[in-house]
């Protein structure tokens, strides 16, 4: 039995992860935490999320005493916190010997030079960063098991990389073009005008400047063109990706490349049949569908995930179970 502390449990991802861990027979929840100045401290989780009324846990402030209690009682800590907050908390809990699963972007790049540009801060813990493993569960299981610092991937990168990594050896130098649409929960729980009911509409954002672009490119080993879109639905991501494959590549070659997922229970791959968001919402699954034109050499692959599940909470749970061999 492994004891897990969840910090940032009041947000969509933290609450979703709480529900997932609560349902796991081999995991227990050491505690749920929010910042000391949070308006949610002291509230039962069910006050914020009535659908979780079966989880009788209260949101505690992350005081120094609380941090000491976590170190004494927990085997691991999950950080569903802002990037700049995770930066420091992850390093501190790692130094105390706990396994850290960070859902922010604070440890996703191995190159410290990336952080000022994409996250607005200098990375102060290069020695911890050097130990961090990118937690793309289907691809990095051995490394996830071997380290105590796991950077859980972003939602768009999870959808995109799951689709693209099997094709890496078949790609030409032409940049893959990724157009991805995410539900409004991807923007977080905090009230914002552009995500309010009367304002939300299908629209691109972060064009040629979204921080997930270099994350995808780094893990793929090739530059990409990535355009995210805000969708007018609650949950889910659909990424439609166009790539050029090397001359002589056949449909059979593509099928062979995607056979890497034959033993991956959470990834479903279909040829000439494309996924929809409704099929993956509230599940930990990724559905892929692809079609290849041998004459032009162009392939289109679509990837559907739930942004709060496979794109965040359920992938964190995958990483926890891989790390602890559960």
Swiss-Prot record:
Its EC number is 1.2.1.38. Keywords: Amino-acid biosynthesis, Arginine biosynthesis, Cytoplasm, NADP, Oxidoreductase. Belongs to the NAGSA dehydrogenase family. Type 1 subfamily. The keyword Cell membrane does not apply. It is found in: Cytoplasm. It comes from Shewanella baltica (strain OS155 / ATCC BAA-1091). The active site is at residue 155. Catalyzes the NADPH-dependent reduction of N-acetyl-5-glutamyl phosphate to yield N-acetyl-L-glutamate 5-semialdehyde. InterPro entries: AGPR_AS, AGPR_type-1, NAD(P)-bd_dom_sf, NAGSA_dehydrogenase, Semialdehyde_DH_NAD-bd. GO terms for cellular component: cytoplasm. It comes from the Bacteria. One of its GO terms (molecular function) is NADP+ binding. Pathway: Amino-acid biosynthesis; L-arginine biosynthesis; N(2)-acetyl-L-ornithine from L-glutamate: step 3/4. It catalyses: N-acetyl-L-glutamate 5-semialdehyde + phosphate + NADP(+) = N-acetyl-L-glutamyl 5-phosphate + NADPH + H(+). One of its GO terms (biological process) is L-arginine biosynthetic process. This is N-acetyl-gamma-glutamyl-phosphate reductase.
């Amino acid at each position: 039995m492994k004891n897990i502390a969840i910090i940032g449990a009041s947000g969509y991802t933290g609450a979703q992860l709480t529900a997932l861990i609560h349902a796991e027979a081999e995991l227990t929840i050491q505690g749920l935490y929010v910042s000391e100045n949070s308006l949610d401290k002291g509230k039962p989780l069910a006050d914020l999320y009535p659908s979780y009324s079966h989880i009788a846990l209260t949101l505690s402030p992350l005081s120094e005493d609380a941090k000491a209690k976590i170190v004494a009682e927990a085997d691991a800590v999950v950080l569903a916190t802002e990037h700049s907050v995770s930066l420091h908390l992850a390093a501190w809990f790692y130094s105390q010997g706990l396994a850290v699963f960070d859902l922010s972007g604070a440890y996703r790049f191995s190159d410290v030079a990336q952080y000022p540009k994409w996250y607005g801060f200098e990375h102060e813990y290069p020695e911890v960063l050097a130990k961090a493993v990118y937690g793309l569960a289907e691809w990095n299981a051995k490394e996830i098991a071997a380290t105590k610092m796991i950077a859980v991937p972003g939602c768009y990168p999870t959808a995109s990389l799951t689709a693209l990594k099997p094709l890496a050896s078949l790609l030409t130098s032409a940049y893959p073009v990724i157009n991805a649409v995410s539900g409004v929960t991807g923007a977080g729980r905090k009230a914002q005008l552009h995500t309010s009911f009367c304002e939300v509409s299908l629209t691109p954002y972060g064009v040629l400047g979204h921080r997930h672009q270099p994350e995808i490119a780094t893990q793929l080993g090739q530059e990409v063109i990535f355009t995210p879109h805000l969708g007018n639905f609650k949950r889910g991501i659909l990424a439609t990706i166009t790539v050029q494959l090397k001359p002589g590549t056949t449909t059979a070659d593509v099928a062979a490349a995607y056979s890497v997922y034959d033993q991956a229970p959470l990834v479903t791959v279909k040829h000439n049949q494309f996924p929809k968001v409704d099929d993956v919402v509230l599940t930990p699954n990724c559905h892929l569908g692809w079609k290849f034109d041998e004459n032009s050499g162009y392939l289109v692959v679509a990837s559907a995930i739930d942004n709060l599940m496979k794109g965040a909470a359920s992938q964190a749970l995958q990483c926890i179970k891989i790390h602890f061999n559960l």
